């Protein structure tokens, strides 16, 4: 048996090392099936697709007694495998029982020995040559965009990705370089060559030479063609609105393709998830007490301002840029906060948007500050993670006027 590892339309058939073939008499295999033994039991725990599956060892042993293996042969570095002994007359079935990693397993095939060896005079005719081709396994890449913190799918706005080779990508049969290290992966469909891939979304912007399909789920894009085994990385050339750029490329490797999920057509699909972060806002509030002149402060304890309370509300709808959902509705109270003992307040992890903060409680002897302070966070670039707004708020002491009245009611 000569075993080759081919790539579709490459025209090359170099030998493939390490493929194992098991040879059984076809009539014996059919007899085992007729007695109720399954395919995997007959082939020692290997199913029709070449996968190892769980089987009852006793039934396997019984099936092997009915349909024993006449030979188990393994291809050498040149792709050749030979039976050690001559096979007697008959029709045989051959199964590839071990396949080199990331090659498709060949389908079962049969051959016949139709002449008795003793009647064959020419030595060359005593060897039956069989060529078996294995297709190199490749996979589609499904890129999935998610929010780093919430893990939500980013469906509101599209993302555009590039895929690059992080090492030279070879045709494993011919050893020819398909993509050089650092090269951007391009895929040609018809007359168009695509060099990037754009996710489906509610709002889609597709750059020139970028592939997009309305048939893909939102927040995803699947490459139109398969990629070969190798090492790759993903970068973003268009970041979705409301998100930060990736801090580093997302690396992935294509290997052990048979472990990947398959689509409805049985093609392998490798999922790669890319997560980005949304910027946030932080409010730093510093509270001071303004002491009026000629005011008795003996009843005012300014050593502990933790009794002062503030309320934070949304001044507009606060939107989650992952999917466009409303996090806080306009006018909605978000939370009430008390100051620290020394009059400070820090509110963190606020989604980008516009807020109002107002004082709702103060200390005895202080005037309640009724001003509503607007705090607005706007994303200005793709790298700033936290936008900080500082508020310095002051309270006046209460001014109380006392009057004295005599017993007659006169002042």
Regions picked out by a protein language model, each given a short descriptive name:
Residues 1-411:
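Solvent-exposed loop/turn and edge beta-strand elements of beta-rich ligand-binding domains
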